[in-house]
Amino acid sequence: MFFNIFLLLLKLYSLYNQKFMIELAGIVILGIIAQWVAWRFKIPAILPLILIGMFVGPFSTLFTEDGTKLIEPIWNPQLDKGLFPGEGLFHFVSLAISVILFEGGLTLKRNEVLNVGPVIFKLITIGTIVTFLGAGFASHFLFNLSWPISFLFAALIIVTGPTVITPILRNIPLKKDISAVLKWEGILIDPIGAVAAVLVFEFISVGKGTEYTQQALVEFGKTVVVGFSIGFSFAYALYFAIKKNAIPHFLMNVVSLSFVIGVYVLSEQFAHESGLLSVVVMGMVLGNIDLPNIKELLYFKESLSVLLISILFILLSANINMQDLYLIYNWNTLILFGCVVFLIRPIGVMLSTINSGLKTNEKAFISWVGPRGIVAAGIASLFGNRLVLEGEPGAEYITPLVFMIVLGTVLFNATTARLFAKISGVFLKESTGILIVGASNISRIIAKYLQKNGRHVVLIDSNKENIERAKGMDLDAEEA
């Protein structure tokens, strides 16, 4: 009898594993197909990824025989179906986002912000406050949500993600300062938005009033201190380990990956949501010091990020339910989207760029481009589900509204950014680009002259000292 029960359990376990394997393999394959489609048609990959996730998730319930999803990301014991038990999906999402943001941090070079550093700082401070207040008020009055739920939604859409900004910048030749502003904002604002969302979430779940507000300020300060301290410390620990040949070349990439995951988890033990800040700081430090084989590390992390982004967006999109979509199927949703894109974002950018030296057309383009990405989607799914289970009124609106903003801004920017760049005059024509081989003194003088006359110049050289001098003159220079 016991042997028969054991065989039955083994058979059920085997069937579950087969389902898990098929669904997971399907997600990976569909994700890579979506990435290829995005490359082929020069659109951000997030767009086809979300559409695929919706198709195998909520939309599939309209045509499956039993009315269930083709892919159910979270295990449902009633349906005997699902990939991740409990909050396993969200733990996976958190770790994956840490790797993605680390890769983004590696690409941030300090020479890029020589002219626009103050603008970036204001965008992630003043711009954040404008978005937080504007989106909070808009969602409250349009959907009659409670103030805490409204401002949780607002905190979640503060972020403009590198997962979306990078493909747009790759496909549109822009002036250096504009690209730098959008790229740095997209990466640095992610941890800020995550921390803001956590503070509002804790306000809803744990405590309210002046006492909690004071505690929230302390927690915010703690998050910043922990994030910077651990990020800097482990960045230099990894740097010296590689520099002293303590890590063999063939293990460098995987050891770096383990550092990223370890730093994220360690940082989270000291301060909630400080992990994202830690990995961004770690990436920034490593990207701006003389780290051997940095390009190889960057290529590895970039490939890994592509895979993780593909999996994440399909899983998170598939996790939405049809009843969530019906909730926001009205004109108020369109009005909210219009407020975020055409009112709140431009106001935030204009206030952040006062006396910045940027031209009006450059400010207009930065205002136009503000797509949301994986951090907004991931945290919205986590907090939305938790608050729904706790019975918080209006919590069911959080996930669909955030996904509406993510999908809407991506679709909007993917289809209009290139055209608006041309209309606003920030688009660099291909014929204006000049490549100079060698970054010697005479080459730098010529390049500077051409740059002042409106030409886009790039210098390449194998000499690191020449490259640094060129970058010090605000020239685009790459190591050969």
Where are these regions (language model features)?
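Transmembrane helical cores of multi-pass secondary ion antiporters/exchangers
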Residues: 2-433, 456, 461
